[in-house]
């Protein structure tokens, strides 16, 4: 027996130790004692007994505390004790008892209870009469003894309990508060129609835990009490009292009129705000208040709060353990007050508490309605109208005076049902509500929509407005299916009801929708449809002045918007096609035509939007004219002169012949084409001769023969003769005289118009005219007529100078010797002084910009450019350039300045109107200029660096005496300090950013140095109270990270400043919410010479203990070794032993005041690359550049700098925000393309990386795009998967972008499969991307936030192209509202979705799974996957580039290709790749891969072997003509091409000259087949051609030495056997590659090597899917389609030449646009020409399987070697291209050579084709500039079209091998989630 006096010294001094007792981490691991009993042994002693717990423990701790607040007494007992006697007790005193079992550092939960000696004796006496044992108590359920009171009154009440949840209570005591609340609620009859209980918790901000109407049963309320969470924060009781008045005692919260209102406050301290007014407001509202104070509560404050009398309404206890002692008294008081209040309410108010009646609604509109009612009986003070939407929403209310019986409800939502309740408010109560519903009307919509003034690119919309509308929203989009981007939206104000819609597509039907807007709400739509006009073609084509080599075309103009015309004219026989573009004229003369030839002409109108349909017609040129006026004169006895008049300027030569009439030999002479006479000598005297003459023209056509008779004479008189033009040689009788006729001129033409001149041309009909008089007069007659005389042999005249843009009448009159002939007149008009067009600004820089324009249609003499600064005063400057220049680089401009630019066209008669525009240079200036460390004689300035600045000039100037200091700094220096300043002086600090020789404008700031110090007054010292636990910030509520602080503890800090760092850490960590494994874990390292771990990540699991540990950190001292500390954090703290967790953010915060004495860059950079986030805080003398190197990017979020340790408060909030945002991210940080992004590298997570893929069944590594990126082939049923909890343990974010780079294979099934999806544990899909190879659609699916399954499917031409066998880059952009698809960096569609819900992490994620699969026995589709990432942002798709795709790679903006090879090296190639693993040997234990052996020498060329089985196809060749496969679907409209004529007479159109970038054009003129054209140089990558002839294989090199037997290594990456290919074909392909490398087109042609889908080993392949029709390629010689051969390897392509004459048409291709016009007028159909170049080769025979090679010897065991280098240039790369290497090619000596069959599978990318136009001139802008630069220092533009020499020579055979796998085992396994979590280390090796 123990005496109380003996054990009294063992007890502790204060019961507060019990209240503050913190259960250890191990609590609960030791079982507690049970069956606690009491027995009185004498009047002051009690025996305590209990049942020992199970398990091992060391002893007991017994605690006894008097309820009156005395000492807590403690007793330690052995583990064998089960009884103890406590003496010296007071009989009528209550005692609290706790018994705890403990073992080492672990303690059990306490068995606890309360007792009083008198109560024990009373129960003992009672039990004797009832034969019961009242001493038994349940220690596990500490219900207060004797609290058996239950309120049984029928009266009901609304009780709201307000609980203090501030930090001062603590989590342990809050459990006691819950127990008190549970006992309190249990005393009342709780129910929805009985007493209702609500509860609010408060600290710094109150919150409703549940309303009065939240729970309908007592059990539900008690369950809510037991789960009440602890809030934490400050103590603002007044705010909380106001809060419950406004929120808890409301009808919508469950408060009932006519029911007692009770408020019970529980608090443990004095309020930090005023409580008197809020408490009075509650009491005035009829709410009876009870106040319960615990521990440190202010009794006076409690009395101010509670209702009277204080004796029954105020309770105060010394500790939380004694709260249950007041439950009975409190519940009895509340119960009696409820009964009394009910009597008062019923007795005094019941008669007057009638509710209003007869609820009526009226004046209903879309935004409100009126509510009316009949008055309530009695004296009503107010009426309260409560209303809210039936579908849910925040209730609102309107209060009106008691005399009113109506209220208007405003600002409601349209077409919404509202619940209405009207309450009568009396002086101390409210009536029941009068309830009803009403629905608002729909918003009024616009009406009478009219669409008019329709053109090809615009229309106007007009509608009737709506009263009350705040504006209108107009949506318009093409009616045809298109992209979401095609829809346009315009918002206008309420005053406008008419709008012009421009920028429309021609000949397109548009849907126009008008919404009336009422704020953010929109009315129902008003919709109309209208079709834009087609682009107007010209009309009324006429042909005139048709000669043998020219014809004049005339047509009526198309419209005022036409930019010009394109004229195509072709010979009907299809042998020649020509094309010319002219300006906006209506006439043009075709020249250099062929005589007697029919021509077909098509004229297209050219617009900015494209070209119109053609206007067509035809004409036939005339026969060539014979010479005219053949005469013989100047006859003598042996000669005479023959003269004639030429009839054309294109005569090549003449044949002149003569023969005597009486017989003799004929003689002939050939004369030049410019001859017009000849003297024939050596004739017989007095003899008549027949003289004949014919003209031979340039095109080798001959004219008719013209003949004349001439004779020699005896005398001296010349005999003139007349001329007879016949086809035979005839003569007329000579006449002695010449007849002269007064005829006018013929064919008067006025052409070559300029702004100041006209050319007049005519044919002379009579050579007897001596002169011609040319007169011209303006058509208006406002100028005097002028005349010019010209000789009779002249037939052309240039009239100048004339007025511009003026019509003239020109008249020609022949003048004869005896008078005038007949006059002929014609009109002509000079051109206007047209201004330049389309002013463009580009190449903006800090001191220059480029101006470009389009030339006007009128020929100019040059251009005058005038430019002037808009804001900076100064004169206007000007410059002149020639007429062949249309771009100019303006230099020496001011930075960041707007300039007005004017361009004038210069003509001989003056200048045109100005083409004006505004341009602005880039701003070269710093930002965020600020000052710091301002002292009496010094100050510092800092700024944000300019990204292009190379230096800074910083000037400080005194505003008092003007003294200056100036310094020049480097481009990376963001701050500078000035010294030797004057105290108390204002200074101006200016910073000029400099870029080379350019200096930007000054950025300035004013600052005043500190004045001389004065003696500050002394003040008494104060002692700061200990810091309280800070509340968690809202931004940190979701934070979950491993956070490590690295604190500088070097000597430079000092004790005082180190304490400030500790305070800063205390505040920063205090802002976090949950601490421990389920929240944020915190560790701290203090560093100087050596780092010291203050505590690890897993050291503390509560904020209280963590903050206490921070305060205990002691100052270290030493030097500054920051790099060593960072490395220590990585090696010691970021480990599993220290508590690091996977898949959550890892954050380091470095705090330092100086420069590190070791290297910090390397280790911080390495950790950042691994996903760690760094924050760097520099103080005072810290090195800013070092902080930037430590901190993550962007530095604005991760680097902080303060002047001193007192300035931490300036950055605290911002740092906490950024750290918590980083810690709250669902996604880890990864590095991608040099950017630090939040996301997931899914290829790594699935093991699809070079070091891991070999462990995955059914996966092989192959070369991807450019033959340098690795990609992975997922073979059939590979079913690559991983558990979701390893990949996305926190699920997916709400916004993210999925990125794939993949290729569909020929053996990919035609049924749907999931490219990637997440399944739950029942294998049900949750989210994923589905491709339907048969339907050519893409579908995204997930579950939305409501749990509904949702899918969006995309289709169309952009979607279909991903199924045609090329690599494509796919972005699936998912946001809370939309799903967007981007293919090859081009948007393909966007659709609306709901926000996603949560996903289960208990399932798996799978690649390629077939949709029809069910359960664990799944099937998967084969495909090639090169890239798979998920980036946690929707903006990534806009930032990402298609650098991995050959056709879209931009070398200037893309990183260099990995291991890109060059053809400029010597013929000898680099060291070969590592050798492959050997054949199967003796199976042994699992070993490592051996070291690669050296490359053996090349063996001699071998003989052609027996054809073997077909290998996988090799890399893709450039797009050529493929073997025709199955018919494809109708093609989409192509890019701009040449529109063809239908009919038999059509001919191929020629390529156009370089044109401007325009809209998509029409197809050119098809024509007849011509002769085979020469092969052109290589063109762009196109459709694969046919394979070449297989070459012969080389013999195997000598076998290496056999290594010692060893265990086989892990499964290697051996690929399938390669393919042998024709060396001639290979070399041709390689030469294309090399030449294009030289030409800068490496990106486009590297795809030759990679885009061939590999197939499993087979001797036969099936035809691939039909190819997608692409855009027309660059015009080149098009060859005829070859006959289909066997399917096989796509061979080397045809080599299209540079744009030139159009080649012959090929076989029928993809369906194009319909031709235009009607049947051609004339001409028989042409015959088909022979096939052109680039045709498919003949098929090779299928090979038979070769013999199996012998098994290799087992190699010696070795460590795993590094992966082999990527592909390299073959030694003959510049004459052929070796495609092997890099991935372990099989080198077995007995591998047979196989002959590849043809493959009809098309693999081409439509994006790789040219747009159907010649490439524009290349300049430094983004638009074509067909003119040279005006500055000599810049290169002239050149035509960027590839020119290659065809490869024709024979070359040696080269063996090609495609890396891949030659076998794999199809895996059929029941995959469970559990087995997927472990490595398949013992996977069976696949059979050979």
Swiss-Prot record:
<feature type="domain" description="VWFA 1">
    <location>
        <begin position="158"/>
        <end position="330"/>
    </location>
</feature>
<dbReference type="Pfam" id="PF00092">
    <property type="entry name" value="VWA"/>
</dbReference>
<keyword id="KW-0325">Glycoprotein</keyword>
<feature type="domain" description="Collagen-like 3">
    <location>
        <begin position="1580"/>
        <end position="1618"/>
    </location>
</feature>
<feature type="region of interest" description="Disordered">
    <location>
        <begin position="1654"/>
        <end position="1767"/>
    </location>
</feature>
<feature type="domain" description="Fibronectin type-III 6">
    <location>
        <begin position="744"/>
        <end position="833"/>
    </location>
</feature>
<dbReference type="GO" id="GO:0005614">
    <property type="term" value="C:interstitial matrix"/>
</dbReference>
<dbReference type="InterPro" id="IPR013783">
    <property type="entry name" value="Ig-like_fold"/>
</dbReference>
<dbReference type="InterPro" id="IPR002035">
    <property type="entry name" value="VWF_A"/>
</dbReference>
<dbReference type="InterPro" id="IPR036116">
    <property type="entry name" value="FN3_sf"/>
</dbReference>
<keyword id="KW-0964">Secreted</keyword>
<keyword id="KW-0272">Extracellular matrix</keyword>
<feature type="region of interest" description="Triple-helical region 1 (COL2)">
    <location>
        <begin position="1469"/>
        <end position="1620"/>
    </location>
</feature>
<feature type="domain" description="Fibronectin type-III 1">
    <location>
        <begin position="32"/>
        <end position="123"/>
    </location>
</feature>
<dbReference type="GO" id="GO:0005576">
    <property type="term" value="C:extracellular region"/>
</dbReference>
<feature type="compositionally biased region" description="Basic and acidic residues">
    <location>
        <begin position="1699"/>
        <end position="1711"/>
    </location>
</feature>
<feature type="compositionally biased region" description="Pro residues">
    <location>
        <begin position="1666"/>
        <end position="1675"/>
    </location>
</feature>
<feature type="region of interest" description="Disordered">
    <location>
        <begin position="1817"/>
        <end position="1841"/>
    </location>
</feature>
<feature type="compositionally biased region" description="Low complexity">
    <location>
        <begin position="1822"/>
        <end position="1837"/>
    </location>
</feature>
<feature type="glycosylation site" description="N-linked (GlcNAc...) asparagine">
    <location>
        <position position="1398"/>
    </location>
</feature>
<dbReference type="GO" id="GO:0005581">
    <property type="term" value="C:collagen trimer"/>
</dbReference>
<keyword id="KW-0130">Cell adhesion</keyword>
<keyword id="KW-0732">Signal</keyword>
<feature type="region of interest" description="Disordered">
    <location>
        <begin position="110"/>
        <end position="147"/>
    </location>
</feature>
<feature type="compositionally biased region" description="Pro residues">
    <location>
        <begin position="1739"/>
        <end position="1748"/>
    </location>
</feature>
<feature type="domain" description="Fibronectin type-III 8">
    <location>
        <begin position="926"/>
        <end position="1017"/>
    </location>
</feature>
<feature type="short sequence motif" description="Cell attachment site">
    <location>
        <begin position="1617"/>
        <end position="1619"/>
    </location>
</feature>
<keyword id="KW-0677">Repeat</keyword>
<feature type="short sequence motif" description="Cell attachment site">
    <location>
        <begin position="1489"/>
        <end position="1491"/>
    </location>
</feature>
<keyword id="KW-0176">Collagen</keyword>
<feature type="compositionally biased region" description="Low complexity">
    <location>
        <begin position="1583"/>
        <end position="1593"/>
    </location>
</feature>
<feature type="compositionally biased region" description="Low complexity">
    <location>
        <begin position="1677"/>
        <end position="1692"/>
    </location>
</feature>
<dbReference type="InterPro" id="IPR050525">
    <property type="entry name" value="ECM_Assembly_Org"/>
</dbReference>
<dbReference type="Pfam" id="PF01391">
    <property type="entry name" value="Collagen"/>
</dbReference>
<feature type="compositionally biased region" description="Basic and acidic residues">
    <location>
        <begin position="116"/>
        <end position="138"/>
    </location>
</feature>
<feature type="domain" description="Collagen-like 4">
    <location>
        <begin position="1664"/>
        <end position="1715"/>
    </location>
</feature>
<protein>
    <recommendedName>
        <fullName>Collagen alpha-1(XIV) chain</fullName>
    </recommendedName>
</protein>
<feature type="region of interest" description="Triple-helical region 2 (COL1)">
    <location>
        <begin position="1664"/>
        <end position="1786"/>
    </location>
</feature>
<dbReference type="InterPro" id="IPR013320">
    <property type="entry name" value="ConA-like_dom_sf"/>
</dbReference>
<feature type="region of interest" description="Disordered">
    <location>
        <begin position="1472"/>
        <end position="1620"/>
    </location>
</feature>
<comment type="similarity">
    <text>Belongs to the fibril-associated collagens with interrupted helices (FACIT) family.</text>
</comment>
<feature type="region of interest" description="Nonhelical region (NC4)">
    <location>
        <begin position="1227"/>
        <end position="1468"/>
    </location>
</feature>
